[in-house]
Amino acid sequence: MKFNKAYVLMRQGKKIKLPEWQGFWAWENNTIMLHCSDSVVMDIRDTDDVSYTFSFICREDWLIAE
């Protein structure tokens, strides 16, 4: 699905991810939290490479994380 739909679902409490990810993104404390495969959890606003992180938003293969 496109990110705009995934974002709405995330705001409703769903966790979202891309097919190759082991981690997921979730809406927590009024921000997107990145739950990485290595158990690191970080606020999207604290990402080191904003361009890399936001390039995912252009993708159309978002999934609900189970």
What kind of region is each of these model predictions?
Residues 25-53:
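Acidic, low-complexity, intrinsically disordered interaction modules
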Residues 55-65:
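Short, structured beta-strand segments at or near domain termini in extracellular proteins/domains
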Residues 1-8:
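Surface-exposed ligand/attachment interfaces on beta-rich extracellular proteins
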